Amino acid sequence: MNAVTAGAHALRHDWTLAEVQALFALPFNDLLFQAQTVHRAHFDPNEVQVSTLLSIKTGACPEDCKYCPQSARYHTGLEAERLMEVEKVLERAREAKANGSSRFCMGAAWRNPKEKDMPYILRMIEEVRGLGMETCMTLGMLTADQAARLGAAGLDYYNHNLDTSPEFYGDIITTRTYQDRLDTLAYVRGAGMKVCSGGIVGMGEQAKDRAGLLMALANLPRHPESVPINMLVKVKGTPLENQENLDPFEFIRTIAVARIMMPASHVRLSAGREKMNEQMQAMCFMAGANSIFYGCKLLTTPNPDENSDMQLFKRLGIRPAQRAQKPDQVQEEELLAEVSRQSEPAEMFYDATRPRAGAARS
């Protein structure tokens, strides 16, 4: 069984660099055909999940990520803002839902959340979920306790990107380690949340680094449920402002290989989309991208406006995905209840969500 066939039929966590590089080296049409075949085996090919991203705390970040205009180390003209008030966040969430978004993502330019801000963060999660939307946050590094509190508040997804390969990482960021990022992802998993993790291409990395990034993501104990693939947005004042553009076909290849390696994950066409023409975006959807950020801004960088996105969707026959009417936990509880009701004898089944008499509590 070759790498492509294995990727189409199984979730693998043992990819080698040689296998990933072999996928990247496929003729372009063959690669897209393989990616689309895998995509159709796991998803409706004409449905795209739509998220809205809001910066709830902007700028003055102490980290030194060379691509980021929110770093306090670079002079980008970005005005720092304090944590947004909860009601203002809810106003934006209501607008996002009305415009067709099923998930609301909230990002804060922090190294890690401070204790004084946690009550407001937790309330944002609870209130946005109350609107019937999925929730996602990106707040920097987390402790195990912080992850547990976010999970208990009902956070659906936590975003924490690996950014690039372990080998190239030190050329881009020095203020936190690759292992720091992996630790945060482990805490998120341990708290029962879904993982959103991807990276940025076009930062001057080599082809083997794009392969290494996808290998690091696919070889996690569980694949991220959402894998954002970002094209570098070059911002004046950052160290990467004059970086050469990545070949568009190489970006599309990265989308396709991500789809093959992580067949059941949503692959998000993320930052940099504002610079892509409609034909390139359509090819990304053909390559297996099935999620986008919707709205005129991603944190602090431009994004196509809502009308142009919906017009493109209409021309391509693409539908925005709808959120499941009931959360996974509710569906699971109802299924268990139905199984228990129909079982004979009833003692053969029990509701795993309820403690059993005499059972030890964890």
UniProtKB/Swiss-Prot annotation:
Subunit: Homodimer.
Residues of the Radical SAM core domain: 46-273
InterPro entries listed in its UniProt record: Aldolase_TIM, BATS_dom, Biotin_synth/BioAB, Biotin_synthase, Elp3/MiaA/NifB-like_rSAM, rSAM
Protein name: Biotin synthase
Residues reported in the UniProt entry to bind [2Fe-2S] cluster: 105, 136, 196, 268
E.C. number(s) listed in UniProt: 2.8.1.6
Keywords from the UniProt entry: 2Fe-2S, 4Fe-4S, Biotin biosynthesis, Iron, Iron-sulfur, Metal-binding, S-adenosyl-L-methionine, Transferase
Any GO molecular function: 2 iron, 2 sulfur cluster binding
SUPFAM superfamilies named among the record's database cross-references: Radical SAM enzymes (SSF102114)
Family according to the record: Belongs to the radical SAM superfamily. Biotin synthase family.
Pathway assigned to this chain's UniProt record: Cofactor biosynthesis; biotin biosynthesis; biotin from 7,8-diaminononanoate: step 2/2
Annotated spans, Disordered: 320-339
Positions bound to [4Fe-4S] cluster: 61, 65, 68
Annotated cofactor note: Binds 1 [4Fe-4S] cluster. The cluster is coordinated with 3 cysteines and an exchangeable S-adenosyl-L-methionine.
Organism: Aeromonas hydrophila subsp. hydrophila (strain ATCC 7966 / DSM 30187 / BCRC 13018 / CCUG 14551 / JCM 1027 / KCTC 2358 / NCIMB 9240 / NCTC 8049)
Function per UniProt: Catalyzes the conversion of dethiobiotin (DTB) to biotin by the insertion of a sulfur atom into dethiobiotin via a radical-based mechanism.
Catalytic activity line of the entry: (4R,5S)-dethiobiotin + (sulfur carrier)-SH + 2 reduced [2Fe-2S]-[ferredoxin] + 2 S-adenosyl-L-methionine = (sulfur carrier)-H + biotin + 2 5'-deoxyadenosine + 2 L-methionine + 2 oxidized [2Fe-2S]-[ferredoxin]
Cofactor: [4Fe-4S] cluster; [2Fe-2S] cluster
PROSITE patterns: RADICAL_SAM
Entry's Gene Ontology BP terms: biotin biosynthetic process
Pfam families assigned: BATS (PF06968), Radical_SAM (PF04055)
CDD domains cross-referenced by the UniProt entry: Radical_SAM
